[in-house]
């Protein structure tokens, strides 16, 4: 990890007019939404800043994501993943993080489409950077970066932690393989690392049948849930209804291509 940005002084923690969250996820692509789903389900107040430009939307048809035997429209896949994160408890802010600073006493303040000192600022204890391929907002944090030609990657410890305490990174931004399923898995891994570091009680994110733990004389571990048969059937019915609604007709959003091929005029 060769290129370390210069560190700027922390900003004031006078955030009375700023939104406060446990976790800020920068980027609403596959890795970011996967991370947000896990942190929100673990009970951490999570907000995702998303400019709507996930690179996965350039795919004509996603054909290697588990669970879709005939593939899935990439724009629909993004919509479904966003809805899953929302149902899990994540909030969303449309826009782009343009500035990120450490805060006196811990945590971070982020500027959305503006400086951190504007009313658009967000405060979070933890940040997950999942904004492939933008790292410009990290310039003042002194995080370890690796420049490879036109690409810049964030160094991590293998589990999503960066060289800056409280800052995590997920997906292609950490030089993981450029595949949707890899990004989803790494987003989940990074989120679980963050949850453990936050000291939030957590064992696994499991929904189990009634008695799975308690009938063996065990308490239900943190992060897990036992549900009875009636609740299982209710959730299954809801999932069928939700999926049928998503797949009722073709997705209306037009196919995207590489930005260099788009005529801006």
Outline where the language-model segments fall.
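Short glycine/serine/threonine-rich phosphate/pyrophosphate-binding segments
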Residues: 30-35, 136-137, 179-180
């Amino acid at each position: 990890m060769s290129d370390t940005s210069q560190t700027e002084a922390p900003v004031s923690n006078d955030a009375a007019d700023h939104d406060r969250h446990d976790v800020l996820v920068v980027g609403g692509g596959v890795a970011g939404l996967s991370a947000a789903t896990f942190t929100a389900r673990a009970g951490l107040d999570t907000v995702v800043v998303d400019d709507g430009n996930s690179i996965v939307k350039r795919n004509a048809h996603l054909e290697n994501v588990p669970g879709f035997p005939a593939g899935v429209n990439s724009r629909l896949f993004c919509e479904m993943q966003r809805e899953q994160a929302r149902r899990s408890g994540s909030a969303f802010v449309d826009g782009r993080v343009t500035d990120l600073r450490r805060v006196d006493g811990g945590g971070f303040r982020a500027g959305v489409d503006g400086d951190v000192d504007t009313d658009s600022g967000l405060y979070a204890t933890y940040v997950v950077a999942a904004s492939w391929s933008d790292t410009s907002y990290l310039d003042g944090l002194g995080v370890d970066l690796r420049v490879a030609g036109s690409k810049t990657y964030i160094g991590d410890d293998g589990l999503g932690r960066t060289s800056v305490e409280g800052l995590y990174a997920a997906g292609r931004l950490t030089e993981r393989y450029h595949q949707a399923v890899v990004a989803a898995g790494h987003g989940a891994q990074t989120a679980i690392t963050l949850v453990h570091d936050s000291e939030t009680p957590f064992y696994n994110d499991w929904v189990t049948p009634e008695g799975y733990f308690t009938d063996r004389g065990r308490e239900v571990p943190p992060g897990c849930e036992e549900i009875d048969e009636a609740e299982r059937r209710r959730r299954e019915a809801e999932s069928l209804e939700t999926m049928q609604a998503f797949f009722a007709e073709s997705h209306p959003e037009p196919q995207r291509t590489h930005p260099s091929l788009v005529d801006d005029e």
